[in-house]
Amino acid sequence: MKITSLHFLIFHKNLNYVSSKVKAKKIFYQRALNNIYLCTIRTMIVDIAEIKKRDNHALDTQESQELVNKIKEIKNSDEQNNSNNNNNNSSSSNFCSNNNSPFSHKETKLMVKEEVPNSIVKNILNNNSCATSIINNKFYTQINNIIPVKPEAMKEENINVSTVNTENDISKEKKENSHYFCDEIKVMKKEYSKDDFVTDVKLEMNDKEEEEEEKQKIGQESTHINIKVEKDTFNECNNSNVNEKKRNRSVDIHNELSNKRILTEDVVVKCNIKNDVKIIVTWNMNSITVRYKNKKKWDEFMNFFNNLNADVLCFQEVRLPAMNLSEPCDNKNKNKNKNDGIRDRGKIKNSDQKSLADYEIMEQILNDDFKDYNAYFSLANIKYSGQLVLVKKNIHIESIRYNLFFENNAHIHHDEGRVILVEFSNFFLLSTYTPNNGFDHVKFERRRLFDEQLQKFVTILRNEKQKPLVWTGDLNIAPEDIDLSHPAEFRRMKKGNVPKEFIGQPGCTDFERKNFQKILTAGNLVDSYRYLQNIKLNEDKKNNIKHTPNINDNIYTWRCPFLLGKSCNKAMRIDHFIVSKEFLNRINKIHIQGFSVFHNNFYGSDHCPVILYLKNE
């Protein structure tokens, strides 16, 4: 017995308008009934309710190609219409529709299995990136750069798919009164590249006996379907790609269709890509746009970056303003850009001439220099603080969080963009730009609150999550005197009358060191660089090898930017990789890139990159 057709149409949805769903339905659903297409998109819609629309035949090769071409036509037409209707500068408009753009909210979207009231579903349809936060924080990541390809040169691959029975058409009255459900769709692969693509789908029903057994296993009326999926291989692949082992893929589709349908316009595809993170870089850039404008220094950095081939880059102090979502309350207020108006901290501001210049610089950086990476921003209101995390597109991310709380509010950013938590398959990566302790009581209190929140956060992470933590970034702490170039001078610095625990250069006071040790204890964490250095020193002692620390050695991550004056030549190690103790066996080495009082390999910043190399699991 044959099931005549089953189709999940996945298509581009530009964030500039909402009508594309309705428009695309009318065009595609008449014939696209027995195919799965994964298009070159970032935001996708999967409408499971359309399963009920059936045809009596599968599309042949020619019809399949016609459908792909039609999808491309509509996508290009929609993008052109949006560009014409947009009031912004043409360059920024085009960039917003770019699939690689972080400005179209390239954050992990969430999908739920609980009942979702109709009012929230409407919010999701109309508000795109923000509305999903209303529901809860079950995270499912986006799938990027999956390309529709020609149906020639196909290779067959068997895939088992389980689904539940399809009901008759849902009446209009039921639709209006019912709740909607978001169920899970998984695309699981050991490796992933844009060469992989799912096309023609053929369905066959099992015998009745097997069907009854399947019903008992699942505990509900269901149909087990075997799907034969054809996979394209590009003729233009490199020889190395041609000789690669076949990638294993399994697709698990399990949606209850009785009074249920997927209506979210966020990604509901979870892509498990078995690529381990091997190299992580952290760097306080001290303004990414300023670094870029110094062509010589930027070229030096890009040469270092290209040779390194890092999997993850954590940039602190990028100094980009967050995008305005509303006008300030008081237009006469001179400080309105600092305090007023609602912001989207995951996007860059481009509403005035000054911010547009930085916006266009970032467009060029991300589309040219970091085109193989997904970008995750967390920004302050003004050109201050802020972070950017770049993750290779072939690395699977399970979730993203932008604060130090574990309520259902992962989308809410720290108001200065100081926290980004990325969950990978086998560990958490926390990047922070920890507040500087400063020299006054206001900043002392700000640092105390941040450290307290961080201590609670790592405690919960240790007790409730079953993954180790890698905490990196500009932590603004030199844990020991050995991390200071001039310990005596650093430790006696102060401004005004302050308690003894606050005496010292920010980053090395007793107050900060005490709180830092509390965080390490609470999270069962270790300063991995110092741990490895101590092992090396002990081995050298056994071999009678003596080391005399030198100001020019690559043992400090921050150096005073002034080459003259009383502060010149001073340096500290305040950028770190702090890891869970059980993660120490994964560390191969840690390298501090910068050296010398002349700031070699600092690439124009007052901080240098620090690189963590991980072993294979």
Curated annotation (Swiss-Prot):
Q: What is this protein called?
A: DNA-(apurinic or apyrimidinic site) endonuclease
Q: Which reaction does it catalyse?
A: Exonucleolytic cleavage in the 3'- to 5'-direction to yield nucleoside 5'-phosphates
**What is the scientific name of the source organism?**
Plasmodium falciparum (isolate 3D7)
What keywords sit in the KW lines?
A: DNA damage, DNA repair, Endonuclease, Exonuclease, Hydrolase, Magnesium, Manganese, Metal-binding, Mitochondrion, Nuclease, Transit peptide
Cofactor comment in the record? Answer: Probably binds two magnesium or manganese ions per subunit.
State the function annotated in the UniProt record: Multifunctional protein that plays a central role in mitochondrial DNA base excision repair (BER) pathway induced by oxidative stress. Has apurinic/apyrimidinic (AP) endonuclease activity towards double-stranded DNA (dsDNA). Has nucleotide incision repair (NIR) activity; acts on dsDNA with oxidized bases thymine glycol and 5,6-dihydro-2'-deoxyuridine. Has 3'-5' exonuclease; can use dsDNA templates with 3'-OH termini including blunt-end, gapped and mismatched 3'-recessed.
Region forming the signal peptide = none
The answer to whether the entry has keyword Lipid biosynthesis is no
Query: Which residue windows does the record flag with biased composition (Basic and acidic residues)?
Result: 329-349
Region annotation (Disordered) maps to 74-99, 326-349
InterPro entries cross-referenced by the UniProt entry: AP_endonuc_1, Endo/exonu/phosph_ase_sf, Endo/exonuclease/phosphatase
Q: Which SUPFAM superfamilies match?
A: DNase I-like
Compartment annotation: Mitochondrion
Cite the PROSITE patterns for this sequence: AP_NUCLEASE_F1_4
Regulation of activity: what does the record state? Apurinic/apyrimidinic (AP) endonuclease activity is maximal at low Mg(2+) (0.5-2 mM) with no activity seen at high concentrations (more than 10 mM). 3'-5' exonuclease activity is maximal in the range of 0.5-2 mM Mg(2+) with activity seen up to 10 mM Mg(2+).
Q: Give a GO biological-process term.
A: DNA repair
Give the family from UniProt: Belongs to the DNA repair enzymes AP/ExoA family.
Its predominant location is mitochondrion
Q: How does activity depend on pH?
A: Optimum pH is 6-8.5 for apurinic/apyrimidinic (AP) endonuclease activity. Optimum pH is 8-8.5 for 3'-5' exonuclease activity. Optimum pH is 8-8.5 for nucleotide incision repair (NIR) cleavage activity.
Query: Composition bias, kind Low complexity: at what positions?
Result: 81-99
Coiled-coil residue windows: none
Which Enzyme Commission number(s) are on file for it? 3.1.11.2
Residues binding Mg(2+), per UniProt: N284, E317, D474, N476, D606, H607
List the cofactors. Mg(2+); Mn(2+)
